[in-house]
Each structure stands twice: as structure tokens, then as C-alpha cells.
Amino acid sequence: ANYLCYLLVFTLAYALTRRPWAAVAIGGLVAMTFGIANYFVVQFRGQPILPWDFQSFATAMTVSGGYEYVPTQKMAVSAMGYICTVVLCYKLSPHGLPAPPRSLRLAERFSALAVSVLLVVMLFPLNGLEGLGISVWAWNQKTSSERTGIAAGFFANVNFMLVEEPAGYSAGRV
């Protein structure tokens, strides 16, 4: 399920650019940035990045200045691997070929977008992650994300943000 979350990012990047090397560059950068940010958040706070953390992003940026960020050796190796992969994908991609017909370009974008929509429908409102055996251990998010994967755990937590209003609720009566 974790791979499906990453596939969503890569297919959206391909739908936007229609270039495999650009999709690898964008998708890899998003995944690597999220992973590094999550590493430091776990180091400082003891739990991973959660969807509702984005609501307090400004506060996090203010507080973040008080910490020291030292990249690990694994981060450096990952960054070098990412750069090498992007360069390799760029070098292997065809250059100087005549542009394919507009209909083919649109079909490629539409296909990538269709896969992205399918992944969104599968992962989000239909609780598709639960069907894949991904559940959130709400009281220990760090262990939960270690078991399920950070991306799948993050997206599984999105369901907790989609709260239905109770029957008979009135803001005036609160």
C-alpha cells in the first residue's frame, strides 16, 4: 500500500510533464523531502508527520529554528542515489525525436491522470487502505507508521480528518 501512495505522486507528475525523467525527478524529490522531514520530526517530537500538522505549519516553522539538523549518512547516500537516478533517466530518455501527434500526447496525459484518479479513489474516501490491511494505531503513530510505511500511514490518517457532523448538531447550542 505504501508503494501505491508513491505511485500516486509519480503518476500525477507524469500527467503534468509527460516526461518519465521529470516524473522521476518530481516524485523522487517529494518522497525524499517527505522522508527527511519525517525523520527530523520523529527525532524531535517522537511521532511522524500527520495530516493535521499542516494546519500548524507556520508554528512548526517558527519552532524549527531552535533545532540543529544534521543529515545522516543514509540521507546523503539517498540524495546521491536520487541525483544519479534522475541523471540516468534523463540520459536514457529519447531526445531530438519529432513530437508525437497531439492526440497521443493527450492520451498519455489522460491515462496517467486516470491511474491517479483510480489511486485516489482506492486510497482515500472508500477506506481502500483498510482493505489492503493498513490500519492506524492512533495511540502510537510512530510504531504504526513503521509497520505500515510512512506514506500509507499518513494517508490512512487523512480519514480521521473527515469527520461527519453529528445528527442534531448546532453551533449555537454549543
Give the ranges of each region predicted by the language model.
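Membrane-anchoring hydrophobic segments
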Residues: 1-35
